[in-house]
Amino acid sequence: MAQVSSEHSDRSPEFWRQKADEYAQKGDFVNQAVALGNLSLALQEQGEWEQAQESSTQGIQILQQLSTTKERDQILAQSLDIQGKLSFSVGDFSAALVSWQEAGKLYQQLGLTEAEDRNRLNQVQAMQELGLFQSACEAIGARIDENVSFCAGVKLENLPENLRRFAGDRLMVLHLQALGDTLRLMGDLESSQQVLELGLELVDGDTETFDKLQLSLGNTWRAKGDRQWAIAQSATSTIQFNFEFCPILENQEEYDSALKHYQNVSENNPLLKLQANLNQLNLQVALNQNILDFNPLEEAQNLNLFNTQSGNNLILNTLQTATCISTIPWQNIAQNLQTIIDVSQQRKDLKTQSYALGYLGRLYEQHAQDSKEYLQTAKTNTQKALSIAQSLDLNAPELAYQWQWQLGRILEKTQSPYSEILSAYKAAFNTLQSLRQELVSSNRDLQFSFRDEVEPVYRKYVDLLLQNNPSQDNLKEARNVIEALQLAELDDFFNDACITAQESKLEDIASDTAVLYPILLDGKIAVIYTLSDSLIDYTIEPLSNPQRFERTINALINDLKEDINNNYQQYGQTVYDSLFSDKLKSFLSSHDQIKTLVFVLDGQLRNLPMATLYDGEKYLIEKYALAVAPGLNLLAPGSLNSLDLRILPGGLAQKAPSFDLVHARLNPLSNALSELESIAQLFENQTPVVLDESFTVEVIKSYFANVYYSIFHWVTHGQFSSNPEETFILTWNERLGVNQLNELIQSQAEFSSEPIELLVLSACETAEGDNRAALGLAGVSIRAGSRSTVATLWKVDDRATSEFMSQFYQEMIENKKTKAEALKTVQESFLSGEKGEALRDPRFWAAFVLIGHWI
């Protein structure tokens, strides 16, 4: 039986046209369709996309009009495969997936397992391009082993031994490669590595598959390095305010592994070797290392990569890298971008066209200092790229946001009207809001560095909104942008857009409460403040030396943590003066009904207890009850009902096996039992204290079957970090990460849908040297579903903690105070000397912070 096959594509299009005509004249319609399919393949090889589409469509239509037979169905499946390949090559991934899915059904009906497996690999490619990672993972995972949950987001401890039956089976090893790639795109990097390494063990002499796996492993190690670098940047670097054309990475050991795998790709397959070389080049340039001695553009031209969408992607990535190599003339890069624009227009590949135009605009923006005319060229190309990205035929918001931001930068550099610049940034912000899921994707096409490519848009937009005597509408928009930034940071922290935000209503906030939004901008600090009646205003204070301000915050935190210096009042006053301008102080004094200040904090300020800000005479806690909110839109609704409170007290008083699971030396919390028992006595129908050997996930869960607990008070070691993998608390035998803690507390949702009222973690601390460690505290609070969380930012003497927490509950339960008022009362009693002269020092009372609802 004749077949449609790429093996025949070395014949000229004219040969297949002649064959198609001959078969048509004979009335042999099946073979006519075969010839038309092969004609389409031959035309694709020459880049004749429209003619290839016509031939493919004609062949399929002929087959669809014939009666169903085994031969007809097999040829139809092959023809649909070719049509899918064509659609994929021109960047129409949705059409490609539809064609391949139709072909796959036919192969399954015909029992052609090998053809079905090849087809499945094609489908997965299309799903990956469309961002349908879960569907791709499930499709490929079910074929490999339907009894293994590859796609559940749970780390694979050990791969099943029976997968070794695929040794030497090229197609199934390629399935493992596709699964590893998909797991990487889903962000499950450890499982991706495991699956790909198993595939490498099972290759058995197939050099092409070996090379594909090496390339995939290199990409997974690169993704692991990028993640570690992002975490390190988050912890130690200052805020990035401006766009970086060529950001430099810091070396991670994962990058060394990536380079090794790229170098392991053999010369046998020129295209795979080029991909590996390009990925290696990209990484070495980003690491500021010596680069490969080869001309990637010349090799790309030799391999005819300008004719396909995937080839264009390779070239575009190369050109992006080339812009950061000083020895490559940027005009050469511009010429190559123009070539891609031309061929993608011929191919009607809108996505590639938008990318190339946008990159061309960015290239001219990058070199704008050479000529004023370059900025106009940059603007024109950026606008074209944006228009295509927003067209109904493409609708690619992940591109549109980049070009909207780029347009805003260019408009600012050309000193365009304020309204035009603001409009561009507003558009970029709105597009970002629609892109929450994509922003946490690990897809290299969609992957954004939060610090470099997302956060600066929010901060610049707020900066613009606060210029030119802002209206109430602009002030409210600025407040909303800050709220959105808080949410985006948490999405980035979890690598998952899983948090549900709800629009807060300021009128629901009591009139005695003011909400303050400090935000660090380029060279200044702004504070937006608002009352329940929707009155909103702002102050801006210049920071002549932002680095010095950050050092002051760090010095204050270190002084509070360590019993070395006593400069915390001096540092506290410096920070107070930066946040509380004369205008803000005047506002607060003229609204003497304000009793509570709620801070939505930014950057390093999150690590600092606001109670320690000092006005020269008093600490802020002496004037106001204080709380920190991760954002008003993230607060759980409702109010405290002390009549219905049930507490589950637990913790560790002895040295536990889990202490060995962390690097730091931990001491037993010898006063844990007295703290827990004194608190438990304040509640009726009290559950016994869950202590030491009983403080395990299994025992805690066993209590949920009979009672709904609204308060969890746990005295145990733990750490908050900007790295979710380093954010944890300890049970007797486990180190619970933020997601495991969430699963534990939320497991009682089987018995009640009510939110948890209060989570107290009274022996935790923030990670040393981590500027955004308190982000982990906010993450714990939100993931646990708690309306409020009380925790310590550093370790406090456990005797002082026991006394502090006992009084806190007395004030809240017996004296009916809000959580913020109760915390204020206890902190003032320590400060006044009521608890003893030794405990007046802020080191003993300032570590306790209230996150979330203050009522």
Annotate each language-model stretch with its function.
Residues P630-N633, S710-E803, Q807:
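Catalytic cores of nucleophile-dependent amide-cleaving enzymes
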Residues N31-E45, I75-S89, L121-Q125, Q177-D181:
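Non-membrane alpha-helical segments in proteins
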Residues I499, D508-I509, G603-I711, E726-L730:
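Catalytic-core domains of enzymes
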Residues I525-Y529, I679, F848-V849:
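Short beta-strand scaffold segments in enzyme catalytic cores
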Residues M1-N38:
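N-terminal leader/linker segments that initiate helical-solenoid repeat arrays
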Residues D592, T801-I855:
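An often Trp-containing, charged/polar helix-loop segment at the C-terminal end
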